[in-house]
């Protein structure tokens, strides 16, 4: 018996790349999958792959940036399968641009798809699960959100808007984990590294070919899907509010923002000169010759 027998999963952006791999991986372990994508042909293709392999899948086409679409997505899962256990928020968009050239449209689109789309689906799923819990219908329910190393730790040139949205998703993961523990829902996030058409297009690279589960390439999205499968499983029910970077077969835990060195000026106010000296000697330290240690990265 697979890890997800009698489980129902929603995966957004599942028509290609990481989302496709996640849908196929969960379905291979018995999950009934709602394959969401904005491109109907792509969603149909992945659902057909699942069904051809003996699994269960239905298609939901829609743009997650629309609040009603994310509500309809949860309703569609309930209408088709009767309940919902797993949500994987993978749908994404990226626009490469220096900050000084970002347009309002670029900003609005990335916010709507990346952050609002993630938040909307999490919100609607949580409302359903909270109601189920209050009605006495308990079970293992889980959310896996997709952040990015452009957001955690951040600082990728020309991807600042994308990184800011992805950083917000990591923060949302921590907050949601605290809120949802009262009704038995775990929430974790991943920072995936894999070859995808979206990433290649943003960087001006050729589109990668389709991957299979057995491909050992470190860029294979199925490496990410394997980690998502674990986080969605009951074996990971003790984990919540965590962020994991996935690079090939390497999994790295990322910690939230943590305080560094501090310095106080006692009762007196800071001056520019005093704070400059404190920064060099107490906050960052100095190297021989007085050169300030640069920021990491």
Model regions and ranges:
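A short, exposed helix-loop element centered on a Lys and neighboring polar residues
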Residues: 122-123, 174
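The beta1-alpha1 cofactor-binding region of Rossmann-like NAD(H)/NADP(H)-dependent oxidoreductases
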Residues: 40-41, 61-72, 104
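C-terminal helical subdomain
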Residues: 189, 210-297
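Catalytic loop of short-chain dehydrogenase/reductase
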Residues: 134-168, 173-174, 178-182, 191-217, ...
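Canonical Rossmann dinucleotide-binding motif of NAD(H)/NADP(H)-dependent dehydrogenases/reductases
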Residues: 2-34
């Amino acid at each position: 018996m697979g890890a997800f027998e009698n489980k129902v999963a929603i995966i957004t952006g599942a028509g290609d790349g990481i989302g496709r791999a996640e849908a196929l991986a969960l379905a291979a372990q018995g999950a009934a999958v709602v394959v969401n994508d904005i491109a109907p042909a792509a969603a149909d293709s992945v659902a057909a792959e699942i069904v051809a392999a003996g699994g269960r899948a239905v298609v939901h086409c829609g743009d997650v940036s629309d609040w009603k679409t994310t509500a309809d997505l949860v309703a569609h899962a309930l209408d088709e399968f009767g309940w919902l256990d797993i949500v994987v928020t993978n749908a994404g968009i990226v626009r490469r641009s220096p900050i000084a050239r970002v347009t309002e449209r670029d900003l609005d689109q990335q916010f709507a798809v990346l952050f609002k789309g993630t938040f909307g689906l999490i919100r609607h799923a949580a409302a359903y699960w909270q109601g189920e819990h209050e009605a006495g219908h308990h079970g293992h329910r889980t959310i896996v959100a997709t952040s990015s190393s452009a957001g955690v730790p951040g600082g990728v040139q020309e991807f600042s808007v994308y990184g800011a949205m992805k950083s917000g998703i990591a923060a949302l993961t921590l907050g949601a984990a605290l809120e949802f523990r009262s009704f038995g829902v775990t929430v974790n996030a991943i920072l995936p590294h894999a070859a995808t058409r979206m990433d290649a297009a943003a960087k001006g690279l050729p589109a990668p070919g389709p991957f299979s589960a057995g491909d050992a390439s470190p860029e294979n999205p199925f490496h990410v899907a394997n980690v998502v499968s674990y986080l969605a499983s009951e074996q990971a029910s003790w984990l919540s509010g965590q962020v994991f970077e996935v690079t090939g077969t390497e999994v790295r835990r990322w910690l939230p923002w943590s305080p560094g060195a501090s310095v106080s000026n006692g009762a007196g106010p800071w001056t520019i000169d005093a704070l400059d000296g404190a920064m060099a000697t107490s906050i960052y330290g100095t190297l021989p010759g007085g050169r300030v240690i640069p920021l990491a990265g």
